[in-house]
Amino acid sequence: MIYRKWSLLSSTILIWGGAATAGLAGVFLFNAKEKFQKYLSGEGQRLRQQDRAAMGKN
């Protein structure tokens, strides 16, 4: 059997960890949290309106 320093699993964990770290850095450094919350709020409103319109048609 061949033993390597890095396996596919550990590299996947490393990639996801890096992405999570970059996301957290964006939230703390660039104050992206408020922008993201505003985006989610707008999307929620839009989806509620679509649901109401679809329910009204039935």
Curated annotation (Swiss-Prot):
It is a peripheral membrane protein. It is found in: Mitochondrion inner membrane. Pathway: Carbohydrate metabolism; tricarboxylic acid cycle. Its main location: mitochondrion. GO terms for biological process: tricarboxylic acid cycle. It comes from the Eukaryota. GO terms for cellular component: mitochondrial inner membrane; respiratory chain complex II (succinate dehydrogenase). Keywords: Membrane, Mitochondrion, Mitochondrion inner membrane, Tricarboxylic acid cycle. Transmembrane segments: none annotated. Component of complex II composed of eight subunits in plants: four classical SDH subunits SDH1, SDH2, SDH3 and SDH4 (a flavoprotein (FP), an iron-sulfur protein (IP), and a cytochrome b composed of a large and a small subunit.), as well as four subunits unknown in mitochondria from bacteria and heterotrophic eukaryotes. This is Succinate dehydrogenase subunit 8B, mitochondrial. It comes from Oryza sativa subsp. japonica.
